[in-house]
Every structure is written in C-alpha cells, then in structure tokens.
C-alpha cells in the first residue's frame, strides 16, 4: 500500500517516470494482476514508454489495444488524484484527495484481503504488520491534515511528507 501511494504521488510530482508508474503497477494494490503488470512493464521497456506517453493511448505493436487497456486501468486513478491535487487550494484539500484515491482504488479492501490470505497461511505476524500499514497511513494523513490543513502545499512537498512519514514508521518491516 505504501509503495502504491508513494509511487502515485511520485508519478504526479515527477512527470510519470516509468519507474514510478511501474511501482504503482507492481504494488499489489493497483487494479492489475502481477502478470498484467509484468506485461505492461515489458511493453513499456520495449516501446520506450515514459513520462507523457503514459497519458496517451499506446500506438505500438500488435498488442497495443490490450496494453492500452492495462494503461487506462492503471493510470486513471492516478490521473484522478493528480486532477484533485491540482484543484486543491490547501494541504487539507490535498489530504482529502489522497483519502479519495485510497477509496477509489479499494485500498482498504485489498489490504484486508491480503490480511485474510496471510492469516489463512498461518502468518499472523505478517498479518499484524499488514494491518499496521493502514493504521500508520491513516495516522499520518490525519496528522498532516491537522498540522497543514489551511496551508498551501504543493504536490512535491506532499509526496515528500507522505514518503518520509511512511519511511519513518516504527515497524520492524513495513510491508508493501
């Protein structure tokens, strides 16, 4: 979850670099399966997809239509977040946009499904860490809202605040 959110914020602030887009794709919290993310990665490398090319239909190769469908599924929520952040007048508005992004991507449901899978495999410690990710993220966003809600914050600053907050989290091992 942390990789998806940080990757999405980096996409927005950094101009959709391939590495950031693929971080979102491979996070386990995008709408793509692992195989779809791998296929999209191979396509992007083969055809030099980077930056603004992620925001336009893919024209290359026999599999362009299939790959473009994956692109749309992956990029649409990030574009919606980008647009909401652009409209945000304050850091509080930006934090609310992140909450909506997490809702729109079903992040909590995906996290709970992962927790159930871990518990069914007898991995209670990992399941606990999994749940802690959500708690830490919500606490971080609540704190950002409380501290910065009326201040103007740009997208780059917000991405750094979120990434720093998640990096500094007190978990022995922060899962993706």
Predicted regions and their residues:
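Polyanion-engaging groove/track-forming segments
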Residues: 1-176
């Amino acid at each position: 979850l942390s990789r998806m959110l940080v990757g999405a914020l980096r996409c927005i602030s950094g101009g959709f670099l391939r590495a950031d887009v693929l971080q979102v794709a491979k996070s386990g919290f995008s709408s793509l399966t692992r195989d779809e993310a791998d296929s999209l990665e191979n396509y992007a490398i083969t055809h030099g997809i980077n930056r603004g090319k992620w925001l336009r239909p893919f024209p290359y190769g026999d599999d362009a239509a299939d790959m473009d469908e994956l692109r749309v599924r992956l990029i649409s929520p990030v574009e919606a977040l980008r647009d909401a952040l652009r409209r945000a007048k304050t850091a509080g508005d930006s934090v609310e946009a992140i909450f909506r992004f997490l809702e729109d991507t079903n992040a909590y449901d995906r996290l709970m499904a992962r927790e159930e899978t871990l518990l069914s495999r007898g991995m209670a410690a990992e399941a606990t860490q999994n749940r802690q990710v959500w708690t830490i993220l919500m606490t971080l966003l609540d704190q950002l809202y409380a501290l910065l809600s009326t201040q103007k914050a740009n997208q780059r600053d917000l991405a750094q605040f979120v990434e720093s907050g998640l990096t500094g989290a007190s978990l022995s091992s922060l899962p993706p």
